[in-house]
Amino acid sequence: MDNTNRLRRLHCHKQPKFTHSSQEVSSMKWEFINMTEQEEDLIFRMYRLVGDRWDLIARRVVGREAKEIERYWIMRNCDYFSHK
């Protein structure tokens, strides 16, 4: 079993936590985020080093926010989004 599948299973079911005051998420926010190969590689390597500390990863990826990188990771690595 390769590391990608293992990581996918470990973190796929992690869902964002919602509070009572949270707003509805529009479909615009969940459109697939395009990353360059260099950004993808950097995100994957940083994830292996620091885990899901998106703020640390975002500091290394120029022009990307932590929320954007987290959404990209969830959409890229969860089975639900891979079938769409």
UniProtKB/Swiss-Prot annotation:
SMART domains from the UniProt entry: SANT (SM00717)
GO terms for cellular component: nucleus
Its job: MYB-type transcription factor involved in trichome cell specification. Acts as a negative regulator of trichome patterning and formation by direct binding to the cis-acting regulatory elements of GL1, thus suppressing the expression of GL1.
Entry's localization field: Nucleus
Tissue localization of expression: Expressed in inflorescences and trichomes of rosette and cauline leaves.
Boundaries of every Myb-like domain copy: 36-73
Keywords: Developmental protein, DNA-binding, Nucleus, Repressor, Transcription, Transcription regulation
One Pfam family it belongs to: Myb_DNA-binding
Other information: Plants over-expressing TCL1 does not have any trichomes on rosette leaves, inflorescence stems, cauline leaves or floral organs.
InterPro entries per record: Homeodomain-like_sf, Myb_TF_plants, SANT/Myb
The protein, known as: MYB-like transcription factor TCL1
Outcome of gene disruption: Trichome formation on inflorescence stems and pedicels.
Organism of origin: Arabidopsis thaliana
Keyword Transcription regulation in annotation: yes
Gene3D superfamilies in UniProt: Homeodomain-like
